[in-house]
Design a protein with these regions (language model features):
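Conserved catalytic cysteine-centered active-site region
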Residues: 26-59, 64, 69-71, 115-139, ...
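Short beta-strand
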Residues: 267-269, 410, 488-494, 498, ...
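FabD-like malonyl-/acyl-CoA
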Residues: 211, 280, 305-477, 526, ...
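Flexible, low-complexity segments
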Residues: 152-166, 299-310, 317, 385-409, ...
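A common structural junction motif
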Residues: 227-231, 296-301, 487-489, 511-523
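Conserved small-residue
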Residues: 12-19, 23-30, 36-38, 52, ...
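Flexible catalytic loop/linker elements that gate and position reactive groups at enzyme active sites
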Residues: 2-12, 16-20, 24-25, 80, ...
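Acyltransferase
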Residues: 271, 451-462, 518-608
Length: 700
């Protein structure tokens, strides 16, 4: 049995968690390693693990598995010394650093062996009684979760495994807790990442068709219909055989590859190719989408309208969006519990990069965003998470999909997100701690509302009951009444609604006289009101930030501050002081978002892409466009939506960018498809004679 004393030698055993149908280690690596020793877990997990550890310590390469029938696919753990892994440039998924058994103090003994403290643990898992096979699976899953940077939360709501900056993930697994056979393992993070999950699969289908005219598009639709009809289209995706799944995935891959070729050809010849995107959760669903768009095609082309379905299929026959892609950054308060919960599994390298750049945990306010009982956020916390969510989505679209915006603007504090996300500010992460402690956000325009107290000349003993209300009304009607209600302010003008803020009783009295009903936001913030003007110099100082050495030259930044009389529609100069002044001007005065969108359209903005949590700003822009009767010329796209699946919403966003003929990369879609084709072929062949490994590495 394992040495359970405090003098146990420290372990550094490299672990690789291998799914049943994973690809194999290369022949070159296998040739430089010892022959594989197969160890199966029968009815005693501890004994099998102890044997495996001894074998590794003797220089062996071990494959730990469950006892299964011959050739039956199974999950496997590959174990070898950390030194051997390093010499062969293998990126382990985790390290086994401590193992103790036969003591109710096993966790303390295992931690001592691993040279770790209990405070180092970022995750602890304890199981009372488990059978040997369940113990193996618990071990396997923890290694896999470390490699996926995934924490299993309550209600099967997994999320990213956040850590403090430059601190590795350390986890403990205690089995048969509080018994004489209790055992504990301590696992630490290594450099290996499991490969990204595929954005597309048999239940997330995505096809792109392009053609010069209606006839060409109709032919393409009919051809795809025939190819899909040749597959078993009456089965649910999970009921398809590996061969049928492989054929379906290969069809998607071939389609997207062909589209890329067509786009490249049309780009060199300057010919615009109208493009249809079809999406569906099954073959049957896509066939229904084909039928629907085939029927609608003549009318859509004749009217040059935009076609969209709930499944995400879309078609814009004559888009006018090229050169007019506008990133729109939402304001404070759009973040929601569990946002972006799935993204890290599909973009692991991006999350690893963001983690290296700064404090990702603080950037997304993870403890409140992903906690089991998400807590109410302060204004400062909402501001941080809002900028963080926009920063993440910007990197995802720009780095992964190579989307390049032509314009950028922000709703309210979204202007700060804009400068932070698009390569203008050198160190946007520095603002996280400043926002948490700055009196601007903690007391002046939120919390105690000291700026309001000063403006209203109140004593510390006098109470302020502040609120804001969304009211469906034109701004002129509200402005006409403001002199009668000096403690109520028109904060925001946004399409067919306005935001009224101030003393709750005063606002309610104004609404009563107006004959309108307001929806209370129940959020304490004096942004965009007269009292905020006293904070102008402080806000300017706060946002005076050093700029990147190389600044974006192809993006036109539009600020609401440009609408103010003193700025006379002059574009913001890209220097620290001008940017800070523009944010302060926007922050401290009424925001006319309607005028901002109209100004953007006048400058050439056409396709408004919301870059942040939820789609609240998209809804506002849609209303403004409808009021102005420009829905054919101007469209909105949301990259995220509360209540929807992160990846499904993202794919709908990508689909609309494609049909609007916006240049982008399809590599994130194709990579996952190619991986699946290879995996399904391997599963179908059932000839797993090599040791599987998927070792996407990240820099140490």
């Amino acid at each position: 049995m394992a040495d359970s004393s405090n003098k146990a030698m420290p372990l550094r055993i490299a672990l690789l968690a291998q799914a049943a149908d994973a690809a194999g280690l290369s022949a070159d690596i296998l040739a430089s390693l010892p022959a594989v020793q197969h160890i199966a877990v029968n009815d005693d997990f501890n004994a099998a693990l102890h044997t495996a550890i001894q074998a590794v310590n003797q220089g062996q390469l071990v494959q730990l598995t469950l006892q299964c029938k011959p050739n039956e696919p199974q999950q496997r753990l590959l174990m070898l010394s950390g030194l051997a892994a390093a010499k062969n440039k293998i990126h382990p998924h985790a390290y086994l650093a401590g193992f103790a058994e036969g003591s109710v103090n096993s966790i303390e003994i295992a931690l001592t062996q691993s040279r770790r403290q209990k405070a180092d643990l970022s995750h602890q898992q304890t199981s009372e009684t488990l059978a040997a096979d369940q113990q193996f699976l618990a071990f396997f899953n923890m290694v896999d979760n470390i490699a996926r940077r995934t924490l299993n939360a309550a209600g099967n709501k997994n999320h990213y495994w956040f850590t403090e900056p430059h601190k590795a993930r350390v986890a403990s697994l205690t089995l048969n807790a509080n018994t004489d056979s209790e055992s504990s393992l301590v696992l630490t993070q290594a450099t290996g990442l499991q490969k990204a999950q595929s954005l597309l699969n048999a239940s997330r289908l995505f096809f792109v068709l392009s053609g010069l005219n209606e006839t060409a598009l109709s032919v393409q639709l009919e051809q795809l219909k025939q190819r899909l009809a040749d597959l078993p289209n009456d089965l649910a995706p999970n009921d398809l055989t590996p061969n049928d799944k492989a054929a379906l995935i290969a069809l998607m891959a071939k389609n997207l590859t062909q589209f890329q070729t067509d786009v490249s050809s049309s780009a060199t010849s300057s010919i615009s190719l109208p493009t249809i995107v079809l999406q569906g959760a099954s073959i049957t669903a896509v066939l229904q989408e084909i039928s629907a768009i085939s029927n609608a095609l003549p009318k859509v082309i004749a009217e040059k309208s935009h076609y969209k379905t709930p499944a995400g299929s879309c078609f814009s026959p004559a888009p006018n969006s090229k050169g007019g892609v506008t990133f729109v950054y939402p304001g404070v308060g759009t973040v929601y519990p569990g946002m972006f919960r799935e993204f890290h599994q599909y973009f692991p390298a991006l999350f690893a990069q963001l983690e290296r750049e700064g404090n990702l945990k603080e950037m997304l306010q993870a403890e409140k965003t992903y906690g089991e009982n998400p807590a109410e956020m302060t204004l400062g916390e909402l501001a941080i998470a809002g900028v963080g969510s926009s920063y993440l989505l910007t990197q995802l679209l720009c780095e992964e999909f190579a989307v390049k915006p032509d314009f950028a603007l922000g709703y309210s504090k979204g202007e700060a997100s804009m400068w932070a996300s698009l390569g203008v500010w050198k160190n946007p992460h520095a603002l996280i701690e400043l926002t948490q402690t700055s009196p601007i956000f903690t007391t002046a325009i939120s919390g105690k509302l000291t700026a309001v107290r000063e403006a209203w000349q109140l004593t510390d003993a006098e109470e302020i009951t502040w609120n804001s209300f969304v009211v469906r009304c034109d701004s002129a009607s509200i402005e006409a009444l403001l002199p009668e209600f000096p403690r109520a302010y028109l904060a925001i003008i946004q399409g067919d609604t306005c935001v009224l803020a101030g003393c709750e009783a005063t606002c309610r009295a104004l609404l009563k006289k107006l004959g309108k009903r307001g929806i209370a936001a129940n959020r304490v913030t004096a942004m965009h009101t007269t009292p905020a003007l006293s904070q102008h110099s402080q806000v300017t100082e706060f946002y005076t930030q050093p700029l990147c050495d190389q600044l974006p030259t192809n993006i036109k930044f539009i600020s609401a501050a440009g609408l103010l009389p003193q700025n006379q529609n002059v574009p913001v100069s890209i220097d620290s002081q001008s940017i800070a002044n523009s944010i302060a001007d926007t922050f401290c005065t009424t925001l006319d978002f309607t005028a901002l969108i109209r100004t953007a359209r006048e400058q050439g903005a056409r396709l408004f892409v919301e870059i942040g949590a939820d789609r609240q700003t998209s809804t506002l822009i849609d209303k403004i466009n409808r009021t102005d009767n420009v829905t054919t010329e101007s469209c909105t796209v949301a990259a995220n939506a509360k209540g929807g699946e992160d990846i499904v919403t993202l794919l709908k966003c990508i689909a609309q960018l494609i049909t609007h003929q916006i240049p982008l990369s399809l590599s994130p879609l194709l990579q996952g498809l190619e991986e699946q084709v290879n995996t399904l072929k391997l599963r179908s062949a059932s000839s797993a004679n090599t040791i599987p490994n998927t070792t996407q590495g990240e820099p140490v």
